[in-house]
Swiss-Prot record:
Membrane-anchoring subunit of succinate dehydrogenase (SDH). Its cofactor is heme. Heme binds at residue 81. It comes from Rickettsia conorii (strain ATCC VR-613 / Malish 7). Pfam families: Sdh_cyt (PF01127). Keywords: Cell inner membrane, Cell membrane, Electron transport, Heme, Iron, Membrane, Metal-binding, Transmembrane, Transmembrane helix, Transport, Tricarboxylic acid cycle. Disulfide bonds: none annotated. This is Succinate dehydrogenase hydrophobic membrane anchor subunit. GO terms for cellular component: plasma membrane. Part of an enzyme complex containing four subunits: a flavoprotein, an iron-sulfur protein, plus two membrane-anchoring proteins, SdhC and SdhD.
Amino acid sequence: MVYDFKAEIVKAKNSGSAKSGSHHWLLQRVTGIILALCSVWLIYFTLTNKNNDINIIMLWELKKPFNVVALLITVVISLYHAMLGMRVVIEDYISYHKLRNTLIIIVQLFCIVTIVAFVVALFYKG
């Protein structure tokens, strides 16, 4: 009995890397480093703020441009980092292609809608 190894090699060559893994890996690490730095600011902001009233925090602390920009960066980068991580988990553990693609689209839409809602809530002057 002769086994055809050529067919197995062709299958392996055609299902290779899409060459996007290193870029994705780098983005995940960069967003993680940015989140670590933003976490230091967020902890400092939380511990130094003695006001328990959210209205006072919104009126005084979030009027400072640095705090607004830092909070915006923290939320946007954390959602982007979560989107990258969830995509990897979905791609690794969901084998059914239609379900995998649907879940990736749902996660991306959720992150985009959440970012837009946060920006609108942050800058809404109502």
